[in-house]
Amino acid sequence: MQLKRVAEAKLPTPWGDFLMVGFEELATGHDHVALVYGDISGHTPVLARVHSECLTGDALFSLRCDCGFQLEAALTQIAEEGRGILLYHRQEGRNIGLLNKIRAYALQDQGYDTVEANHQLGFAADERDFTLCADMFKLLGVNEVRLLTNNPKKVEILTEAGINIVERVPLIVGRNPNNEHYLDTKAEKMGHLLNK
């Protein structure tokens, strides 16, 4: 186990009341959060979203990505389902950090795509560690999920880490003229399933 469960509190939202559960990485002290809606106990697979932190999309309403749209759509679907989990994975900018993300944006403004920009900065296309999310699911007592994602790599890593993904639920929202090239690059170079 790479992290521990450290705190929880009620979080009222426009979608209803969630239980906010805080986790801390044992090696680094970095924190992550789960939003739990309804009763997730039992043997029925839980609708879940692993949402990687995106300050620009989630809080600043950037149209450069689909992150904020995905966050809102996931919370809506979880609330409509009556139960579910959103893991807020605190690895900003596919885990290159906010300042490097801004640098990557500047490179994208010069014509690089999102993958090329990461490479220019010395990073892989995706630096995230989804095994942390498997540990969060386990600490919440959940082993079977219906995962809201377009990223088959996320499904693969969580499965390898012991989470039974019984269904991949597409989450295709937020395409606009400002992020079309970004989304096309994610599909072409990172294997994201954006047409299904």
Curated annotation (Swiss-Prot):
Sorted alphabetically, the keyword list is:
GTP-binding, Hydrolase, Metal-binding, Nucleotide-binding, Riboflavin biosynthesis, Zinc
Q: Which GO terms describe its biological process?
A: riboflavin biosynthetic process
Consequence of substituting C65S = Loss of zinc binding. Loss of ring-opening activity. Can still remove phosphate from GTP
- Provide the catalytic activity annotation: GTP + 4 H2O = 2,5-diamino-6-hydroxy-4-(5-phosphoribosylamino)-pyrimidine + formate + 2 phosphate + 3 H(+)
Instruction: Give a GO cellular-component term.
Output: cytosol
Which coenzymes or cofactors are required?
Zn(2+)
* Gene Ontology molecular function: GTP binding; GTP cyclohydrolase II activity; magnesium ion binding; protein homodimerization activity; zinc ion binding
Q: How is the cofactor bound?
A: Binds 1 zinc ion per subunit.
State which Enzyme Commission number(s) the record gives.
3.5.4.25
What is this protein's function? Catalyzes the conversion of GTP to 2,5-diamino-6-ribosylamino-4(3H)-pyrimidinone 5'-phosphate (DARP), formate and pyrophosphate.
Q: What is this protein called?
A: GTP cyclohydrolase-2
Q: Which organism is it from?
A: Escherichia coli (strain K12)
UniProt gene name: ribA
